[in-house]
Each structure stands twice: as C-alpha cells, then as structure tokens.
C-alpha cells in the first residue's frame, strides 16, 4: 500500500514539475543553427569561419573519419583561406569525460578560438563537452550534467554531421560517459547549440549499411518520442517531428539499400536535423533513458539500442500514444486496411507500430536487446529513472517497479529470441 502511495505521489510530482518546465520552455530564447546544405556544402565552411573573424580552429573528429579521408576537402579549403587548425581525433563511440578533458587541454594549449565538430553524434557531443568545460573551467563534467548548468557562452561550434541520426548539430544536449562509473548522462544548455550546421550528403555516401540503419532509426526515435511527449512542444516542434518522420518513411530504407543515392542521403540528413531540433525542446523519453543506461553500461552503439527499444516502449505506453501515432500514420500516408472501413486511432497507431517493427527487420536490427545481464537490471533502472523523471514529459510515467518490469520483459524477449535461433 505504501509503495502504491509513493508511486502516485511521484507521478503527480513529475507532472507538476513538467507543468512548470512547460512555462519555462515557452519563455526561453530558442534558436536554430544557420544551415549550409547540398552536395559540396562542406567546401563553403572555411569561408564562413573566416568571415566571422576566427583564426585558429580545433577540428574535433574521430580516427576513422580522418583515416577515410573525409576531412581532405575541408582541410584543403582551410589552407586556401589561410585558416590555422589543430585536429583532435581521440574520441570513442561513446565519448567520455576523459576525452573531453583531453580536448580542453588541446583547445587551450593551442589557443584555438572556435571548433569544427566533424563527425557523428559522438564527435559533436564531445565538442560540446569541450566547449562547456572551457566556459566553466572550475566545474567537472559531472557537475554540468542536467539542465542549464553551463549558462555561459561557449566557443562557437560549426557542426558537420557525417551520419544522419543524432541530430546533435541542432540540439542543446551533449551525452558524456563517466569513465569510472560507466554512467552516461546529458548536459543540456542553450549555450551548447552549434552556430552552423553543414548538411553535405556526400559525406554520408560511404557509411556502411549497418551504420545508416542505426543512425536513421535514432533520428526516428527522436522524432517519435518528441511528438508523443508533446507537453513542451510548440507548433514548430510538431512540424519538425512531422517532417522528420515523413522523410525517414520515404528515404531510410533507400539510403540503406543504395548508399550512393544522394537524394535519400540528403533527406536523411534533413530528417536528423529536424528531429534534433524538435527534441531539443520537445524532449525524449524512456527509449532514451533506458537506452542510455544500456549503451553506457555495455559500450554498444547508441543508435542500435534506440532502434531496438523504440517500438517496444511505444507499445508499452498503450492507449496514451494512440492519437499521436495515428497522426504519424496519416502524415506518412500509410495504407490502413479495416474490414468495416472504420479507421480508429488505435488501428492507425497499430499500422505505424507495425511499420516500425517491419523496418527494423528489413534493416537487420534485432528485435530485443541481447546485451542485458540480469544482475544489471536494477542499475539500468536506477540510471534511467534518474535521467527521465521528473524531466521527460513522457505520455505515461513509470515508477521504478514498472520500469523494471519493462526491462525484464526485454531480457526475457532476448532469451526467447536467442533460443529460437539456436533451435
């Protein structure tokens, strides 16, 4: 009985907190990055950097990006424009507080005055973390995690995404993992929004199909979670979600099957950007909260975990998301078959859910997360609860026990899926 009362009070507290946050969201000075887009757009970036009076750039990137030669055109243009630069490429797929500190040391030691974040979400998150620490030299990453704890201008970031998923080029969030604890948490502050985003589809042509799939599903997750949350959204965020989901519905499978299709690649970059801008205000939900805990604990790609969990969490929300998922079904002009011709919100929502599940299968993404260990379930729940409640305006609030039941259901699903494969 006491547990039930505690749960009810917790859920009421979350909704009161979110009502206050909604008022704050409406008063904040939201902005979007300026955009350079289209094939070859990256060549225009050095001129934009120079025209804004910057002289020495820290290029934050990943070792694989550098090895693949994706930086070459940018570096040639920078030399032509006589811009000095230093490259920092010591970043893992889940950036850590130690990597951020390494970047801070280079930025300050080399007397850089801006950054180009050239890579996927991990690179951009690391660049934002570097910026936050430069702005707040006396605060460790742990003390900057949460909402609005930077509150000072950071060095200007020019974001060049080489994947189409995180949307970090259009967000105020940076997800950083603590090396000692493996805890993965977000820094969220308006100061972290990049000033420029360069959407050049040519940079994504060489992505392996698996990466295209996982990052594309991550973008879908951002859009669907932001749309179904809705509490913090304005009409602008709803429009961004709608555009993102429609573009993903039209182009993700094409980009996966034919990576050289520049239109599909451009569509996916725009989808990731729109979804990123949408969840910046609209927020994410339990897919991300649970997914961050899992990917941080086991070191698996962020997009993979999001892709696996998305349909399961939406199904677990039940009737609380029928209307919103039905909207997305309509936005994508999906065909809905019913015997009597009556197409209810529940039927349209189910059509959208089935599309997500079928898309996962076509993209080669497992149905369940097979990396979860039973002894880690309580830790996953603890971290996810800490991240999500009371901030995320989810359609249905789960207490720790309800979330544990969901994670255990994922564990059992993975066991059954594994047993079927071994038969």
Name what the model sees in each region.
Residues 1-87, 417-423:
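An N-terminal, well-structured beta->alpha segment
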Residues 2-14, 329-423:
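C-terminal charged capping/lid subdomain of soluble metabolic enzymes
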Residues 173-282:
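Carboxylate- and glycine-rich phosphate/diphosphate-binding segment that chelates Mg2+/Mn2+
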Residues 66-138, 254-265:
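N-terminal small/polar loop signature for handling phosphorylated ligands or for N-terminal nucleophile
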Residues 42-45, 67-70, 97-98, 122-127, ...:
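Short glycine/serine/threonine-rich phosphate/pyrophosphate-binding segments
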Residues 282-353, 357:
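C-terminal catalytic subdomain
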Residues 98-202:
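Glycine/threonine-rich beta-strand-loop-alpha-helix active-site module
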